[in-house]
Amino acid sequence: KGNYFNLNQKIYNKNKDFKDFQFIIIAPDGTQDEVKEILKGLNDLTNVSKWLFVFAPENEIQEYYNTLHLKGKLNSDFGTSNVYIVDKKRNLRGRKDKAEYKEGYDASSPSDLYNEMTDDVKVILAEYRLALKRNNAKRQI
């Protein structure tokens, strides 16, 4: 639950008003009641309309995780404390250069979320705004 609180405070609340921003959490089948409790707690803090949960069998979660080609592994509950930025085209976003390689952000670390994920979310949202401006300019011509 602490990880969801960290995400909510450091990332979600700052970006929830952007049309294209949402959280999608993939969770194992059978955790629906636990998720309801998490959402109930978050609902006291924020509008949870952009917190979306997808429930799937454990093997499908593992298969999806494998398609991302991540260095880390899922734990025995088919989860991880890491969160990832996936863009509209379903590309994994992060920091790719060797000096500061980062494919995910540790949700149990408020400083990781605040110092790094915040900046990386700003970058992708700026890209979306720029693309929208370009498209609108082309329509006016």
Regions from the PLM with identified roles:
Residues 11-17, 47-51, 77-81, 109-111, ...:
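Glycine-rich loops and low-complexity Gly/Arg-rich segments
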Residues 11-15, 65-68, 72, 121, ...:
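Sec/Tat-exported extracytoplasmic proteins
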Residues 2-54, 58-64:
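Structural microenvironment flanking redox-active thiols in thiol-disulfide oxidoreductases
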Residues 57, 63-78:
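Surface-exposed short loop/turn segments
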Residues 79-141:
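Thiol-/selenol-based redox modules, centered on thioredoxin-like
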Residues 44-48, 73, 100, 104-107:
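A near-ubiquitous, low-amplitude feature marking generic local secondary-structure context
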Residues 40-42, 68-72, 102, 134:
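General N-terminal targeting signals
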Residues 34-36, 68-73, 91-99:
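Short, charged low-complexity intrinsically disordered segments located at boundaries
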